[in-house]
Amino acid sequence: MIKNNKKMKIEKVVLSIGGMGDSLEKGFKLLKILTGRKPAKMKTSPNRRIPALGVKPNMEVGAVVTIRKNIPEILKRMLVTIDNTLKKKQMSENNFSFGIEEYIEIPGIEYQRDIGIRGLDVTVVFKRDGRRVRLKKIKRGKIPARQKISKEEIIKFMEENFQTKFI
């Protein structure tokens, strides 16, 4: 049986917001409104301390939601906010990221007085079949370079499926 391992697809979309204290709570509310799911808390490492920024070990510094279902629908809503245009420098191997300055630009979302004006980051991660070789615990292997997704392949995929323009 021959399998086409060159076929790529979107693995997940990650929405994240940074902040501390009251700002973080507003970010939690915003992500819950956008996705309908409970956000996870991002913490600093147990040994990390940055006094200049007021960061202490195990401090909550952000919120994140990972979306694996209804990806095309959500991604189209997010791309509308940036006019379906991405820069090539926003691309990386196997993923790309972009920022949304104000959540009220997302279609279907209205201004929330208790949240105020906030932005968020969107990361889109791609994958190919055969990735489980690297992720499994027993008999783990390495993924060859041909399985990694290049910037050019991501650009082609986004232009075909989402009519995205690249600068």
Model-derived features: where do they sit?
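Ribosome-associated RNA-binding proteins
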Residues: 1-167
